[in-house]
Swiss-Prot record:
It is an enzyme of class 1 (oxidoreductase). This is Ectoine dioxygenase. L-ectoine binds at residue 129. GO terms for biological process: ectoine catabolic process. Fe cation binds at residues 146, 148, 247. It holds the Pfam family PhyH. Involved in the biosynthesis of 5-hydroxyectoine, called compatible solute, which helps organisms to survive extreme osmotic stress by acting as a highly soluble organic osmolyte. Catalyzes the 2-oxoglutarate-dependent selective hydroxylation of L-ectoine to yield (4S,5S)-5-hydroxyectoine. InterPro entries: EctD, Phytyl_CoA_dOase-like.
Length: 295
């Protein structure tokens, strides 16, 4: 574990709530980039920004075809970077996708994508994590409520909240097929979870979150205070959200599959140290140790 002062304690004997110690926007309001000043203000207030169409239909078709190629490739399935759904035994996620696929690497470098990350974080950025997510119809399980930063801080060693994620839809996101839910404004309070981090926790948590999960009481208070926003939209839409937003998604029991590309950008001025609340680092395909800026 790290010896750096821990601004956001977690995984102790009791659940704790700490006001955010970091800015939400690290750039100045007039920082050039694709996000308008009004949208930056909205992002700072709510913790997220929805973009109705980030990429066009032809691009959606390209990325969706690449996703399908990867999840049906036996070599990819056998790779430790692929996570399999426990019940159906179908691929749920493929990590480090920007290193596996040049097509997705190009998406990461696209100025519409990385430019927004630089604008929000106020610096050059690198990819802390990338993956494709697949939620087939008829029973694909969801992700329980959590803050990504809680995990990235506790288990990967990210010191500060200077990280932003983008989820780019490759299928239609209906209000019924297990879409992303966020508690608006929850990013301004850090919820430190109770309980020590088990050894090799990542192997279990990538299929079903346990350690780092808030209590029912805390979630009820946050939901009463902030409400819950469900994100819908056409293929090609995108949602940017702060690393500390409480978010989750439900099971997909509809016939309509849902898939997306998920990219996590971290500031080059916030590189990972040793974990704050775990005995060892998670593997690099989950939490990068290559801090090379995206160019």
């Amino acid at each position: 574990m790290t010896t750096i002062t821990d601004l956001y304690p977690s995984r102790g004997a009791a659940e704790v709530s700490v006001p955010r110690q970091d800015p939400v926007l690290w750039g100045t309001p007039d920082t050039p980039g694709p996000i308008t000043a009004a949208d930056l203000q909205s992002y700072e207030h709510d913790g997220f920004l929805a973009v109705p169409q980030l990429i066009g239909d032809d691009e959606v078709a390209l990325y969706h075809a690449e996703l399908e190629r990867l999840i049906h490739d036996p070599a990819v399935r056998a790779d430790e970077r692929s996570i399999v759904e426990p019940q159906s035994q179908e691929i749920r996620s493929v990590f480090e996708v920007h290193k596996i696929s040049e097509i997705f690497a190009q998406l990461v470098r696209d100025e519409r994508v990385v430019g927004r990350a630089r604008q929000i974080l106020g610096s050059d950025v690198y990819v802390h994590q990338s993956r494709i997510n697949v939620k087939p119809g008829f029973g694909a399980s969801g992700f329980y409520w959590h803050s990504d930063f809680e995990t990235w801080h506790a288990e990967d060693g990210l010191p500060n909240m200077r990280t932003v994620s983008v989820s780019i839809a490759l299928t239609e996101n209906y209000d019924t097929n297990g879409g992303l839910m966020i508690m608006p404004g929850s990013h301004k309070t850090f919820l430190g979870c109770a309980g020590a981090t088990p050894k090799d926790n990542y192997k279990k948590s990538l299929q079903m979150q346990d350690a780092g999960t808030p209590s029912d009481e805390a979630l009820t208070k946050f939901a009463d205070r902030h409400g819950i926003r469900l994100f819908t939209g056409r293929a090609g839409s995108a949602t940017w959200f702060d690393c500390n937003c409480l978010h989750g998604s439900g099971d997909n029991i509809t016939p309509f599959p849902r898939s997306n590309v998920f990219i996590v950008f971290n500031s080059v001025e916030n590189t990972a140290v040793e974990p704050f609340s775990a005995p060892v680092r998670r593997p690099e395909f989950i939490g990068a140790r290559d801090f090379t800026p995206v160019r």
